[in-house]
Amino acid sequence: MVIDTNGLGVGLADEMIREQTDRDGVTYPAYGFMNDDNYLKIQPKNIPKILYGIKANGNLNSEIHGNAYTRLSNGSVRFLINEQAAKSALLATQVGQKMSLEQRVRRLMPHEMTTKLFEEMANLRLKRTTDNSKITLEQINSRFPKDKYSAFAYGQWRIKEIEEEAYKLKKKRSIPGKRQLIFFTGG
């Protein structure tokens, strides 16, 4: 799970490393950071380390936006169908027609979130900056948040980092100095 540990995200991060109990008495486990030295010092040692903190600044945000754009452009990302299409498809089935309203809402929620992500992305535009090498996005209408886009972009960034780590590990394991040639038959 990726958390922006700048600004308000610090409060969320602080709470994530502590066990939580809700009003009904249900206890939720604490989770730890795998990459943040500050949290590694203060979080309990025995908790699952599934959190990844990003402290985004102007340069990193530019790289994150560029990566998201690249992955969208080259077809690396596939989205669910939008909420309206999913609702029509679901109601066209007998199973969907027999669902209670609550079941239907639960089943369509991922599609609703996809639709909201599209709306947020449509509300963003490139912002002119003095440094033309940086990608900066601004909201066209400030009433619409960009939280889902940010979560999407940070997730894509973390995927890129994991892929790069795997590639480096694979490259490191190959025999140094030995060329690996692959031959194909003509066709």
Region roles according to the model:
Residues 18, 85, 138, 168-169:
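Flexible domain-boundary/linker segments
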Residues 59, 140-147:
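Structural motif
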Residues 130-142:
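Short, solvent-exposed helix-loop connector elements
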